[in-house]
């Protein structure tokens, strides 16, 4: 049997190398040079998602020397978070997307995915959390702005609070300490929202506040709706904060779900969810620096210049121009959160990025469902990822939570949004 042969090979490799075969095999799918298997295509992809179960009195698992607490509960699908200059935390809550199904397999996939999501209605709001005395207990949980349209990305600069709805980038005037918006938002720029196969709009802002960067996902897996449906999609927009004028900053990014600016260098980075239906171990979701004018492959190629022969017509010139991402995260982990760390997280976790992995729906053995730390050295990813927040899945295969946004709080914490349990977690170094 193929499985027996594979297990024998792994066992022999473990004996020869002195490390566990399972760990060695997993490590091959991470980093700058992942092992890519041959594509596997079938009538239906593998589909499996864990049944939700409450946290009860349990908590996520964090590394030794850290502790975790829930600082907000009973939310309505928390996605991304933002720490304001005064320490207040904003939480974007909502669920978007309304793409019609093209094939029966799309209907089946939606049913499978729905089993792993909350039954709570979309909040379509931004909630504010406040810990006034700095004791780690957030005694105030109040709605800052409501009647939004599936808000996702959040950014702040010099009294301007930006929210990326699924259809528009908007701005609120903000004064230090206010607990609710004083007026309706001003639209900065309209964002693509027709069909909205991938609806999330990731957001970050340049250090000088001049430009906003918005991640806009594709309208399909691999152009099943035609290239016209992909106009202005599968890319990062650069938007002038004052005028709202935009331009494509980088293209060929199937679904850039979180963006962050690297401290010091000002370099834009992203996590990207790659295409489906090429097998359980293709294609790796990834972390990458985003180069202005760069093309990252979608839909014609993946992980550099590996051709996706499902796409018609082919474009060899585009394939040749495809940039290889910096760091593979593993296939189908569904990375949705990204933030750079700092010294407040301790020496071991001071240099690198935290990534929230929402978890797979299209593998027999689920992956993701955790927050990882990717260490950096000299400004680049270096080494294997480290599990930082786990325990979202139970030993019997059920799911307590699904991490989305991750934000480093300068006061010394990692903030994690959990959109299944409708909780915001706070991870701190033990005192």
Predicted segment positions?
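C-terminal motif of bacterial Sec signal peptides marking the signal peptidase cleavage site
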Residues: 15-18
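Blade-level signature of beta-propeller repeat domains, shared across WD40, Kelch, NHL, RCC1
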Residues: 407-431
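Surface loop/turn motifs at the tips and blade-to-blade linkers of beta-strand repeat domains
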Residues: 71-74, 142-148, 188-195, 248-252, ...
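Asp-box/WD-like beta-propeller blade repeats and closely related beta-sheet repeat scaffolds
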Residues: 137-160, 165-206
